[in-house]
């Protein structure tokens, strides 16, 4: 049920008042030199907030309006001391994300986790899998994954997995068998009865744009739009579709709450209509057996393109127009666009999206693993306040909002992809327990704000600001589920 979005104004005002109060308190302490008295005031304020805390109502596992935390397991928390994040480490740090106790304010309060790929892969990012039914040994075992899911259920956290259906690894057995068959076949015509996997991919005797040569053959080529290590799948093949149905059922039966669908705009290169049909097929397959599963697709483009993908019936599409350094949020925060445009656009998208799917759930996000970290969008005096405001603007949008790990700490990282996936900044000591070494090609750079250890007890920190924004989002369902209206001046 849609409700008027009055809570947006209330919660937004509270957040801004908190920021202003924090700045004013710091200034007064500096001017008057009353450090002890200032500390006493801070402690008293924190006690008062805790004593008057209103506990948010729990969100049922069937409710797909949530606040998701995107986790790159490789860089989050190391549970076995090898320098690489893993599922045991993530499970150990779940209390950081959500401790399952709504009365406490020690956790961030997110009630959803988007798990970046965890299936076996030859790359550090793992978007090119070699096995859709297993866990990458770097991350642990299937038992570790099941223990993680169980711990999430206890805390009311819904877990969605990254599912890359556009391509596999070139080391996947399907692709390896198909290539071996074609090399032996030579210039003949492939028979799927002899090797069904030749129709799982897009092979051709003609070298087209985005096609790479089959190694060991001077006749055959295969489509690989991203790079030759990621051969594109032929998602119109019925045998492959049957396999994908089994893959989805395998994970959903284990208790996974849904999927983030990678690169949906690339399923069929340059063919939005075909991609929408494929999304519609997958959505129908999943929802027939798991009606409460949550599906959100990545259509990396502008709104004029991705709005059409709601015709598929999918729950959510990432709202790219508001994200990144040139998105609506950053433009408003920098003062390059009037603040009224933010409200205006929120109202406009309700009509735009609902015209395609009346049951849509918006998926606002501010940055992710493919974008520069948001703390780098702002510089100079006031940049901390800008970082906070931008985070709050994302979290005040309706739908299921997404936070990329470390954004709540104001982590930095730009340029090459590895820099955007740096180790979670739990501690400024890289040798501290659980700290990850990060991707091997990551540059050396310093963070802009303090680590979690340094921010957690500072009431005016970026972390505390994010935590309060998530709290208000949890407290007022109108923020997640409401519509937007301008208030009269």
Roles of regions detected by a PLM:
Residues 1-9:
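Bacterial N-terminal signal peptides that target proteins for export
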Residues 10-16:
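Hydrophobic helical h-region of N-terminal Sec-dependent signal peptides
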Residues 284-376, 396, 418, 423-444:
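Glycan-recognition surfaces
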């Amino acid at each position: 049920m849609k409700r008027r979005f009055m809570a947006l104004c209330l919660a937004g005002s509270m957040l801004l008042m908190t920021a202003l109060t924090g700045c004013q308190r710091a200034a007064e302490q500096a001017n008057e030199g009353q450090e002890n008295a200032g500390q006493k005031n801070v402690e008293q304020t924190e006690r008062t907030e805790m004593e008057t805390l209103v506990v948010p109502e729990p969100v049922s596992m069937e409710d797909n309006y949530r606040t998701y935390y995107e986790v790159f397991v490789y860089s989050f928390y190391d549970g076995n001391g090898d320098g690489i994040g893993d599922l045991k480490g993530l499970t150990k740090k779940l209390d950081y994300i959500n401790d399952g106790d709504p009365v406490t304010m020690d956790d961030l309060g997110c009630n959803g986790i988007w798990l970046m790929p965890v299936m076996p892969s030859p790359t550090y990012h793992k978007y090119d899998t070699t096995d859709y039914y297993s866990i990458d040994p770097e991350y642990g075992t299937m038992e570790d994954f099941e223990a993680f899911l169980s711990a999430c259920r206890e805390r009311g956290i819904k877990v969605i997995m990254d599912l890359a259906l556009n391509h596999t690894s070139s080391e996947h057995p399907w692709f390896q068998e198909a290539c071996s068959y074609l090399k032996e076949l030579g210039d003949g015509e492939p028979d799927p009865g002899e090797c069904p996997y030749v129709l799982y991919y897009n092979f051709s005797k003609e070298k087209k744009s985005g096609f790479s040569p089959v190694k060991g053959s001077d006749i055959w080529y295969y489509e690989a739009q991203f790079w030759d290590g990621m051969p594109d799948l032929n998602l119109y093949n019925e045998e492959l579709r049957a396999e994908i149905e089994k893959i989805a059922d395998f994970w959903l039966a284990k208790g996974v709450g849904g999927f983030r669908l990678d690169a949906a705009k690339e399923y069929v290169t340059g063919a939005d209509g075909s991609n929408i049909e494929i999304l519609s097929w997958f959505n129908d397959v999943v929802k027939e057996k798991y009606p409460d599963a949550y599906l959100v697709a990545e259509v990396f483009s502008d709104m004029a393109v991705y709005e059409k993908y709601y015709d598929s019936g999918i729950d959510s599409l990432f709202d790219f127009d508001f994200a990144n350094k040139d998105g609506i949020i950053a433009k408003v925060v920098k003062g390059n666009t009037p603040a009224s445009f933010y409200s205006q656009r929120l109202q406009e998208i309700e009509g735009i999206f609902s015209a395609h799917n009346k049951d849509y759930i918006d998926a606002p996000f501010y940055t992710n693993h493919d974008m520069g970290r948001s703390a780098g969008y702002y510089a100079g005096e006031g940049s901390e306040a800008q970082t906070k405001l931008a985070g709050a603007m994302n979290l005040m949008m309706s739908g299921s909002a997404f936070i990329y790990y470390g954004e709540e700490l104001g982590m930095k990282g730009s340029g090459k992809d590895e820099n955007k996936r740096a180790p979670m900044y739990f501690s400024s000591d890289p040798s501290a327990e659980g700290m990850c070494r990060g991707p091997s090609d990551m540059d050396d750079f310093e963070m802009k704000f303090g680590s979690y250890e340094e921010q957690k007890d500072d009431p005016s920190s970026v972390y505390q600001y994010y935590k309060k924004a998530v709290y208000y989002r949890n407290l007022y369902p109108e923020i997640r589920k409401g519509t937007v209206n301008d208030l009269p001046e």
